[in-house]
Regions:
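A generic local structural motif
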Residues: 22-23, 89-93, 132-133
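Short, conserved loop/helix-junction motifs that constitute active-site signature segments
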Residues: 27-29, 99, 138-140
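Active-site segments of SGNH/GDSL-like serine hydrolases
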Residues: 107-113, 133-169
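Bacterial Sec-dependent signal peptides at the C-terminal "C-region" and cleavage site
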Residues: 16-29
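Bacterial N-terminal signal peptides
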Residues: 7-17
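Alpha-helical structural signal in soluble globular domains
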Residues: 58-62, 131, 135, 139, ...
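Conserved SGNH/GDSL esterase-like catalytic core that processes O-acyl groups on lipids
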Residues: 30-35, 41-127, 156, 165, ...
Length: 175
């Protein structure tokens, strides 16, 4: 129930952001290509049918045929280049770049709260994020990049303990 609520909330926030992002200018070149870049949350891990229940699939359903929404999620991916599984070293990253999207939705950072990552590389988070955004803008200078806030975490998830919750809040405060 809680997971489904957060997915619906996430979809609503994406849809609202997209509708306010000036995509009317993009409609001249239909379909508008949307790349959903992220980790297991984007990928749809844990869902009964990720092909229809992941947020990129739901976003495609909401936006309709004028959009081509693709899922470039990689479970365990980190934004940090020196993280334990950097997104930029995954095939999904190469595929997302090749897609040359008009809109890129980035939902990365939750795995960066891992004790192997955040304590050691937190100072590189913003520069690594900017580098990722710049890469997509070099491929398509007119693309719009939307950054999703981190999915809320709870004490019920065994991985998110003690300092990890604090690091999660630090990442969410980055602007």
């Amino acid at each position: 129930m809680t997971r489904r609520f957060f997915i619906i909330l996430l979809l609503f926030s994406y849809f609202f952001t997209l509708s306010c992002a000036g995509v009317e200018n993009l409609k001249a070149s239909l379909p508008i290509k949307v790349a959903c870049v992220g980790n297991s949350i984007t990928y749809g891990s844990g869902l009964a049918n990720r092909e229809t229940e992941s947020y990129p699939a739901r976003l495609q359903e909401m936006l309709g045929n004028d959009y081509d929404v693709r899922n470039f999620g990689r479970p365990g991916a980190t934004l940090l280049r020196k993280g334990h599984r950097p997104y930029i070293q995954q095939k999904e990253y190469a595929n997302a770049k090749a897609f040359a999207a008009d809109i890129v939705v980035i939902h990365l950072g939750i795995n960066d709260t891992d004790p192997r990552n955040w304590p050691n590389y937190r100072d590189e988070f913003i520069s690594d994020y900017r580098a990722l955004i710049d890469t997509f803008r070099m491929i398509n200078p007119k693309c719009r990049v939307l950054i999703a806030r981190l999915t809320p975490i709870t004490i019920l998830h065994p991985r998110f303990e003690s300092g990890t919750r604090d690091w999660h809040d630090e990442i969410n405060e980055v602007e």
